[in-house]
Amino acid sequence: MSNSYSSNAQKKVISTSEWDDKLAEVNISKSDLNKLVMNYLVIEGYQEAAAKFQEESSTQTTVDLASIADRMAIRSAIQCGDVEKGIEIVNDLNPEILDTNPQLYFHLQQQKLIELIRKGMTAEALKFAQDELAPQGEENNKFLEELEKTISLLVFEDTAKSPLSSLLDHSQRQKTAGELNSAILLSQSQDKDPKLPTILKLLKWAQTQLDSKCIYPKITNTVTGEYE
């Protein structure tokens, strides 16, 4: 089969038929694809969809699907500012997660302090910092620095004017919830992030590399797999 070239910088042109022939030579098992889908559903927390997919495809997972609901409840609690509830659920799920991860535990306590500051509960925030966080800071300089930054929010009558006001943003809750979610997944021998988005990023990168070398049937719709 001969290759053709375009007049645009003499780029190699690959026809759709040639491309399809090459794709046909790639062997991807249905089982591997099913595992990829299950990986995404479990990690992203789609419990009902994962259970239905498991039933229909007979794809097994090492995770108890019932635990997905607990993990989502924990993430939701942290994102809503109810740190105590999140800690309670994770301890019921697996107390070793926090017992073996002092940094995670500190960040949860730090988030609890942030929530007290957000509510304007200055006296309670100072007492909580002194009783719960200061002892951890004495044993870890990094924790102490983070505690001092958090407490500095109280210097400003209007916390929104603090250089560290980002600690009060919803993104900080999401960051803490994400750290805890990753720890739970790790305890269940799961990836902390689903594989599918990474594969799609690799696809985009590979197509960018090809764009400079040839003209080919480029995928423009990753949902349907349609070429341009």
UniProtKB/Swiss-Prot annotation:
GO biological process: proteasome-mediated ubiquitin-dependent protein catabolic process; Wnt signaling pathway
Record-annotated LisH domain positions: 29-61
Transmembrane regions: none
Role: Core component of the CTLH E3 ubiquitin-protein ligase complex that mediates ubiquitination and subsequent proteasomal degradation of target proteins. Acts as a positive regulator of Wnt signaling pathway by promoting beta-catenin (CTNNB1) nuclear accumulation.
UniProt keyword annotation of Repressor present: no
Gene3D superfamilies in the record: 1.20.960.30
Name under which the protein is recorded: Glucose-induced degradation protein 8 homolog
Lineage, broadest ranks: Eukaryota, Amoebozoa, Evosea, Eumycetozoa, Dictyostelia
Domain of life assignment: Eukaryota
GO cellular component, one term: nucleus
Keywords (A to Z) from UniProt: Cytoplasm, Nucleus, Wnt signaling pathway
InterPro entries membership: CRA_dom, CTLH/CRA, CTLH_C, LisH, Ubq-SigPath_Reg
Keyword Cell membrane: no
Any Pfam family the entry gives: CTLH
Organism: Dictyostelium discoideum
Domain CTLH as annotated: residue spans: 67-124
Chief site of localization: cytoplasm
Family from the record: Belongs to the GID8 family.
PANTHER family referenced in this protein's UniProt entry, alphabetically: RAN BINDING PROTEIN 9-RELATED
Subcellular location: Cytoplasm; Nucleus
